[in-house]
């Protein structure tokens, strides 16, 4: 009977002696956590320098790329308002256009309002014998060498050239078009001498009179009308001879 009681007494002693120690340990741990909550751990100490190094590397790379991007990427501009490089502008102000020395248009213009360029703008200062470009048409080259003045761009139907003797000043109807009055007169004279018939005036398809007594091939007068009445009477007589029954049937109501 003494054994169980002895074991229970020992257990109670151990429990009573261990409680103060555990409480003391818990209090010490809480005090340490309250005293050093902001102190960084080992991992945080290692991460901060890495971030600083990465930030410096990114700044250096961005600085290198910024200089390159300024020269590579330019703003998209209108074709007629494209700005020239600063080097070309400075060279043009100095009068040095480079080895080629060609004239470059500053602004794109409307085809019908393009200003005529002077001789000096198309050629070098030292060139005295200047010729227009070879891609121009022949009639333009002929007019250039004949010192004909350049005219303003006109409507296709009202285009007149100073180097032409007979100008087409107004667009005409296809059936009434007379390009050269002298050629028209000569053609009419030759037709009159040969005795041929002149072509009649162009008419509307629904109003065109062909074979009329008063037409171009007929004679409008008393003789023509009498001839027309005679033809009508002859036609009625022939119809009566061919159908006597019809004639009798037509006369019956008249006799009654």
From Swiss-Prot:
Keyword annotations from UniProtKB, A to Z: Amidation, Cleavage on pair of basic residues, Hormone, Repeat, Secreted, Signal
Protein name per its UniProtKB record: Pro-thyrotropin-releasing hormone
Recorded GO CC terms: extracellular region; secretory granule
Tissue expression as described in the entry: Specifically expressed in hypothalamus and testis.
Family: Belongs to the TRH family.
InterPro entries: TRH
One GO-annotated biological process of the protein: negative regulation of feeding behavior
Region (Disordered): 76-128, 151-215
GO molecular-function term, one example from the UniProt record: thyrotropin-releasing hormone activity
């Amino acid at each position: 009977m003494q054994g169980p009681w002895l074991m229970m007494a020992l257990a109670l002693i151990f429990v009573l002696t261990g409680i103060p120690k555990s409480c003391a340990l818990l209090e010490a741990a809480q005090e340490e956590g309250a005293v050093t909550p902001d102190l960084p751990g080992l991992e945080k100490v290692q991460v901060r320098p890495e971030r600083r190094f990465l930030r410096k590397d990114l700044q250096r790379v961005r600085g290198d790329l910024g200089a390159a991007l300024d020269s590579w990427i330019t703003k998209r501009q209108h074709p007629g308002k494209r700005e020239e490089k600063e080097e070309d502008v400075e060279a043009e102000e100095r009068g040095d256009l480079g080895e080629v020395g060609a004239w470059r248009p500053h602004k794109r213009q409307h085809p019908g309002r393009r200003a005529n360029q002077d001789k000096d703008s198309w050629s070098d200062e030292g060139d005295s014998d200047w010729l227009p470009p070879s891609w121009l048409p022949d009639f333009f080259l002929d007019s250039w060498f004949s010192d004909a003045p350049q005219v303003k761009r006109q409507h296709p139907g009202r285009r007149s050239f100073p180097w032409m003797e007979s100008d087409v000043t107004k667009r005409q109807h296809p059936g009434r078009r007379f390009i050269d009055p002298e050629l028209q007169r000569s053609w009419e004279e030759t037709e009159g001498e040969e005795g041929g018939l002149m072509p009649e005036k162009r008419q509307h398809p629904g109003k065109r009179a062909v074979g009329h007594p008063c037409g171009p091939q007929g004679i409008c007068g008393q003789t023509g009308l009498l001839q027309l009445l005679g033809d009508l009477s002859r036609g009625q007589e022939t119809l009566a001879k061919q159908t006597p029954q019809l004639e009798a049937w037509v006369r019956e109501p008249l006799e009654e």
